[in-house]
Amino acid sequence: LNFLRRISTRRLLSICALALVIVIGGTAVALATSGGGPKPPAKPLANAVHDALEAPSVPGISADIHFTNNLIDASSLEGKDPILAGATGRLWASPSGGGKLRLELQAEESGNDSQVLIEGHHFQVYDGTSETVYEGMLPEEKDEAGEEGVPSVEKIQGEIDRLGKHVELSGAIPSDVAGKAAYTLQAAPSHDGGLLGRVEVAWDAANGIPLRAAVYSSESSSPVLELEATGVSFEAVPDSVFEISPPAEAKVVDLSPEEVKGPHGDPTKALGAAAVGAAVDFPLAAPQSLAGLPQAEVRAIEVDGQTAALVTYGKGLGGIAVIESKSEAGGEEGELGLPKVVIGDVKGEELGTALGSALRFSREGVDYIVVGSVPPAAVEAAARGL
């Protein structure tokens, strides 16, 4: 969060998109067309997941890809940004070294290609349009298999039951993906899903390799984000393929979480309006309710080396978050000419996407960013409530 306040609109959009590219690319290889191949036999989801985990591993994956991004209206973009507008490219994956994945998205005409690289828990994204490298660490997860091997069907079913309390799961749907027998899983928030409709993932019934991933908005039957590939090959990939060298002059942005410090430079875990209000050096705006949503949490965070505040309202993806930080001169102006809205006696800049909205404005020395998986009208109402 140490750069959100001063980042340009184009870069902010790129970060939102590349974050979803990492999620999709890290879990799936999508196939472009459906063929006439057979479908696998029907089976419970727990059994399908167990069989996928138990399937023999492949030495590597190579594929041509097509990335579709309908988060925002492409007509509002200046130039061809492969992360924002979608693009064709290549994908490689290897199980060596803790797991490696590389996505190459090729920009039309400009030649400003973008690269996504995941090695173990570390990720690096090069945005060729802005000549910026974003890097950081992915959350570490426990190895469920570990020394005990693949989890039992009963254990997997227990996890599915736990997840089912919050997410509606379709079960393992026998599918035909590009002539390959596959199982498709549809997952949708059971409540408080905001603008997120559902996520679909399909995997090869024979080897457990993910074959398709797509994200849908609650307001459209077409995917907002989709990763498609053709000509998939399950062969070993040389380590040299995963060596990416961005230009030496490229700007590097570290997205790793930072330690939050108090006014005296000491680490702080301030929680609650009173504690956070005492930790920041600006008037904290934290009403008990905002846009009809009850206050959920007030937490101290780090912005530009200074203590700032994160105030959340509501629950789940239908909630709203407010980031408040002390204003500084020199912030970059938006590059896409986004709509301006009036918030009280000041003007704000608003970004609306198929999966959520964000609005930022400054008032009396404080910068505000209001964001949520909600329509623009909801973040506008929240901003006015501040």
How would you label these PLM feature ranges?
Residues 65-66, 102-106, 183-191, 213-216, ...:
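Short beta-strand segments that buttress and anchor functional surface loops
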Residues 1-19:
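N-terminal export and membrane-targeting signals
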Residues 71, 79-87, 258-366, 374-384:
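Short, solvent-exposed recognition patches
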Residues 104, 124, 170-253:
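Gly/Pro-enriched, hydrophobic low-complexity segments
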Residues 87, 92-95, 116-126, 198-214, ...:
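A short, surface-exposed beta-strand/turn
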Residues 88-151, 218, 222-226, 359:
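An acidic-aromatic
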Residues 4-8, 24-52:
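C-terminal region of N-terminal signal peptides and the immediate post-cleavage residues
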Residues 54-76, 99-103:
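A short, Trp-centered hydrophobic/proline-enriched beta-strand micro-motif
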